[in-house]
Design a protein with these regions (language model features):
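The feature captures the beta-strand-to-loop junction immediately N-terminal to the Walker
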Residues: 40-42
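Conserved ABC transporter NBD signature motif
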Residues: 63-71, 80
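Conserved ABC ATPase "signature" region
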Residues: 116-134
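ABC ATPase C-loop
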Residues: 155-156
């Protein structure tokens, strides 16, 4: 559960690429310790650029970013990576070593652990991510899902306070998505701050309580996911599609079933339909007595 502490604070940040392309405009946001936050928007909205500013890979043209109350302007990427871990959409670009075990060890270099401490962490992570049997395998021989799992394992081995995932469900099968969801739930128990960039609106509706919506390099909405992603104007502006639950709700209204528009979860929809059918059944029985 979140505590009222702005772990990430962005004040009026702008970023313009060397070619003159504007990627971020007047971004103001704060993310609390322990929060789970989604960032959504169409391609080119500035989502990936924004998360890269959090660990110093991109430095804002103007404005300031604070992590744990510290301005990160003078912090190196190596220093920031101890606090902020990012798993990018294409994890194969994050793999550098000859074996899986070496890859995870490589991620610990900036922590200056002794050999024993390092090996304990590596062994624990290999076990937790079900990668023990692959420790001597080359990362180049892994499937896309396994490579993404290795990238996540390498970041988790550093135990950063902030975890950022760029399109974690993209290209993943049902089993891999389930593994990721369980991973996130466990990290929430450890009061980790988690940011997820995603286009998966159904995933966001079910698992992400707060969503930041971006369009044209700006934040256009920030608040409870169930309110933002059911707002037709905002969804259309960002080229997203209304959640299936809302489309189903509309279909019910079209056939005369007045389902409350406030229903935004499958569980609540099922409860409503069961109640509706019971009431209708009771009325039919009463009319035939």
């Amino acid at each position: 559960m979140s505590t009222e502490f702005p772990l990430i604070l962005a004040n009026d940040i702008d970023y313009t690429y060397p070619n003159g392309s504007v990627a971020l405009k007047k971004i103001n946001l704060n993310i609390l310790k322990g929060e789970l936050v989604g960032i959504m928007g169409k391609n080119g909205a500035g989502k990936t650029t924004l998360i890269r500013t959090f660990n110093g890979l991109i430095r804002p043209t103007t404005g300031s970013i604070y992590i744990n109350g510290e301005n990160i302007k003078s912090k190196t990427v190596g220093t920031l990576s101890q606090k902020v871990g990012i798993i990018f959409q294409n994890p194969q670009h994050q793999v550098f070593s000859n074996t899986i075990e070496e890859e995870i060890k490589f991620s610990l270099k900036s922590l200056n652990l002794n050999k024993k401490e390092s090996q304990v962490r590596v062994d624990t992570i290999l076990k937790n991510f079900d990668l023990e049997k692959y420790r001597e395998r080359s990362p180049l021989n892994l499937s896309g899902g396994e490579t993404k799992k290795l990238a996540v394992a390498s970041i988790f081995c550093r135990n950063p306070e902030i975890l950022i995932f760029d399109e974690p469900t993209l290209g993943q099968d049902a089993k891999e998505i389930e593994f990721f969801i369980n991973l996130i739930k466990n990290e929430q128990k450890n009061v980790k701050t988690i940011i997820i960039v995603t286009h998966n609106i159904e995933f966001a509706m079910e698992f992400i309580p707060r969503t930041i919506l971006m369009s044209d390099s700006q934040i256009i909405a920030d608040g409870p996911t169930h309110k933002i992603l059911t707002n037709e104007f905002l969804v259309n502006k960002t080229s997203l599609i209304l959640p299936q639950i809302n489309q189903f709700n509309r279909a019910l209204h079209d056939i005369g079933i007045n389902c409350p528009l406030t229903i935004t979860s499958k569980k609540n929809m099922i409860e409503f339909l069961i109640g509706y059918l019971k009431n209708k059944s009771n009325r039919v029985i009463g009319e035939n007595l």
